[in-house]
């Protein structure tokens, strides 16, 4: 039985029509994912975005736009009895060239173009990627 929520906030960091993706371990395998993480108590979604990008990659946001809200029920794969709620924001970075991996869990990063095959492993990330590809 579900007994709580895990709210996740993710950033679509776009520079020159390319999207920042991360590679990190998740449940025993390496996955491709977007930057972001869990909302902490007393924190708003934008505060979470700013904190996660600073903590993980030493990046700062200068502009953000809500992009996608998860539409269906998703149960957490990593946390027993928790429902995940995911919010995605399209963000502009202050100085994207200053990217520096600070989180030891992140193995690598890369920038992908809109015409790339979908690199994402997690189902909602795949939906978000397709929506991003269709932006003009």
Q: What are these model-predicted stretches?
A:
Residues 1-34, 93:
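N-terminal strand-loop-strand
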Residues 34-68:
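The catalytic Nudix box helix
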Residues 6, 14, 34, 46, ...:
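Short connector loops at helix/strand junctions that flank enzyme active sites
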Residues 20, 28, 73-75, 118:
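Flexible, glycine-rich phosphate/dinucleotide-binding loops
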């Amino acid at each position: 039985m579900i007994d709580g929520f895990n709210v996740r906030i993710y950033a679509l960091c776009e520079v020159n029509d390319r999207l920042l993706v991360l590679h990190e371990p998740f449940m025993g395998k390496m996955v491709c994912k977007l930057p972001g993480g869990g909302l902490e108590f007393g924190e708003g979604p934008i505060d979470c975005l700013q904190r996660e990008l600073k903590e993980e990659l030493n990046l700062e946001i200068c502009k953000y736009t809500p992009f996608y809200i998860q539409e269906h029920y998703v149960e957490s794969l990593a946390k027993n009895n928790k429902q995940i709620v995911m919010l995605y924001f399209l963000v502009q970075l202050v100085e994207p060239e200053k990217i520096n991996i600070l989180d030891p869990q992140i193995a690598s990063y890369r920038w992908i173009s809109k015409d790339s095959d979908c690199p994402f492993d997690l189902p909602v990330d795949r939906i978000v990627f397709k929506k991003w590809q269709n932006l003009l």
